[in-house]
Amino acid sequence: MAVMTPRRERSSLLSRALQVTAAAATALVTAVSLAAPAHAANPYERGPNPTDALLEASSGPFSVSEENVSRLSASGFGGGTIYYPRENNTYGAVAISPGYTGTEASIAWLGERIASHGFVVITIDTITTLDQPDSRAEQLNAALNHMINRASSTVRSRIDSSRLAVMGHSMGGGGTLRLASQRPDLKAAIPLTPWHLNKNWSSVTVPTLIIGADLDTIAPVATHAKPFYNSLPSSISKAYLELDGATHFAPNIPNKIIGKYSVAWLKRFVDNDTRYTQFLCPGPRDGLFGEVEEYRSTCPF
């Protein structure tokens, strides 16, 4: 019977320890390699890692081109402009409506801003400037259909028609809520200082960000934006952001808060890009001397 000397015993113990260490290291590397690419596996992720500075800038990381949609060529809406990233890839698509008596020019800045973060965006003129919210819902839907089916091949080839969203100002915001209630397949809705006679949107299941303005006397938040938000089901992803010191017409000029949180919402829910959750949960700080009067949501998303 062989007898193990102290030297051989120490050598054997060291060998077994090294084997155990190597096995543990291999298991750790395997676990890390499996867990690390979680967000990278998202096929809809576009653009660099987001920062506050990037989202608050006047334009995003993508160069943008435009395509005019004449009133004569438009079907079901009043024409407009399509903004799209020059980079050849597929993107979610967004339609944006102006408000009562407003024209496309009043929301044009949003088209270019959002497109520069990796979306195909159409800003529209309505058939008449006096069109009511439910008519604007129909026109937003027609604008989405135009981008998917009738725009140039350059635009159509860039659109992922399974990832659509709508936005609108004032009565366009009311139209946004109406279309969201009619099309649960939409990935996101963003009403901006919205106006609508209907106060109950409990049928909406689309992730919805409502942006109100504390000095709005046309669609006061107490009778519009807040009741709209409160009526949305608590089971859906939703958020309410109230601008501090802003009026009903805040969405008509470039606004870094509207731009930042609109892009973050679209990225999170149209692109399923969780890199943007950090800007929405817990969201902006509100209170005295800030740019945001109030923020609340159904975080976590």
From Swiss-Prot:
InterPro entries recorded: AB_hydrolase_fold, FrsA_esterase, PET_hydrolase/cutinase-like
**Bridged cysteine pairs (disulfide):** C281-C299
Q: What is the effect of changing G102A?
A: Increases activity on poly(ethylene terephthalate) (PET)
Q: How does activity depend on pH?
A: Optimum pH is 8. Optimum pH is 6.0-6.5. Optimum pH is 7.5.
Q: Which reaction does it catalyse?
A: pentanoate ester + H2O = pentanoate + an aliphatic alcohol + H(+); an octanoate ester + H2O = an aliphatic alcohol + octanoate + H(+); decanoate ester + H2O = decanoate + an aliphatic alcohol + H(+); a dodecanoate ester + H2O = an aliphatic alcohol + dodecanoate + H(+)
Which of UniProt's keywords are assigned here?
A: Disulfide bond, Hydrolase, Periplasm, Secreted, Serine esterase, Signal
Use in biotech settings: Has potential for application in biological recycling of plastic waste products. Shows promising applications in the laundry industry as a cleansing agent, as it is thermostable and tolerant to surfactants and organic solvents. Also shows promising applications in ethyl alcohol distillery processes as it may be utilized for treatment of molasses wastewater.
Temperature behavior is: Optimum temperature is 25-50 degrees Celsius. Optimum temperature is 55 degrees Celsius. Optimum temperature is 60 degrees Celsius. Optimum temperature is 65 degrees Celsius.
Its cellular-component GO annotations read: extracellular region; periplasmic space
| Reported impact of E293R | Increases the thermal stability of the enzyme
Activity regulation, per record:
Activated by magnesium ions. Activated by calcium ions. Inhibited by the serine hydrolase inhibitor phenylmethanesulfonyl fluoride (PMSF).
Protein location: Secreted; Periplasm
Methyltransferase listed as a keyword: no
Role summary? Catalyzes the hydrolysis of cutin, a polyester that forms the structure of plant cuticle. Shows esterase activity towards p-nitrophenol-linked aliphatic esters (pNP-aliphatic esters). Also hydrolyzes the triglycerides triacetin, tributyrin, tricaprin, and trilaurin, with a preference for short-chain substrates. Hydrolyzes the hemicellulose xylan. Capable of degrading the plastic poly(ethylene terephthalate) (PET), the most abundant polyester plastic in the world. Can also depolymerize poly(epsilon-caprolactone) (PCL), a synthetic aliphatic biodegradable polyester.
Assembly description: Monomer.
Indicate what this protein is called per its UniProt record: Cutinase cut2
Instruction: State the species of origin.
Output: Thermobifida fusca (Thermomonospora fusca)
Q: Which gene encodes it?
A: cut2
